[in-house]
Amino acid sequence: MKKIASILVTAVAPFNDHAANRGEKLLGNASSVKRRPDGRVYVSGQMQRHVLFSAIERLNAMDPKRGDTYVANGDGISTDIAKDLRSDLGGFLSTSKGDYSGRRIAPISATPAVARAKSKVGHDLLIRLKMNEEESKQKQALAVNEFSQADDMIMNFHLDIGAVGVTKKFEYNKEESHVATHYEQHINDDEHLRRVKLFLEASRSMTDYANQARNAVSGEPRQVLIVLDPGMSRKAIRYFEEGTSSIEQEAILKELQARGAQYFIGDDTTDEYSSVYEAYMQAIDAVQNGKLYRPS
């Protein structure tokens, strides 16, 4: 059995009446829904990572095997990858080390979540009630708020398994030529497996988007393709895209099989495939019983 070197999750989640990632103030004094030039709304990759790490934090807090691990706040990331999951899985750039900047490339990467089709954007008129006329001489405050009516959002996450819990160190000779690379492991195999499973679990637990008090949405998938890959590929992120034909979908799956990758398809809208829940359980079981790549 080939070792699993990376995991790709590509999923479709329905968002209704949402403002999951407002952006520029195109309407004056209220934020507008982020959307592309083609009219499709999107949630930025930064927001997707925020929601994913929020899910990882909750899952880790409930895990009796978490030990002294934690997920640091986004504004206070440490460089302790043995304990800080955001530092390990999310990477960091530390500029407080004198002439040297500590830099860690994130094992987790995410794409923006993009609507499959052109979005229909609605507008709410907001009025700030002036209860006491003596309080302010300004005119009554009016604002327009945008929301998107209904979108099937395609989102993608990728994990470089070999980079989890490890730092890469370079050896140079007197001429300052790079002559060797060494890997330092900061966690044992059990903790490595636990963090990989946390990533998978978090990708189906996406809820902490913006504006959840008034425009709550769920990023939990309706359709999903999970790839346990012996290599490093993100080609399968095209699987659910609107322009991908059934022929191309079949070609993607055949290529995965030819490379020795395992894949799991979940679809809650048909009985042709397993449900999303079943697909995740199958993938987690395969990770649990498989061999994960760790550089040495």
Model-inferred region functions:
Residues 1-296:
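RNA-binding basic/glycine-rich loop and surface signature characteristic of RAMP-family CRISPR effectors
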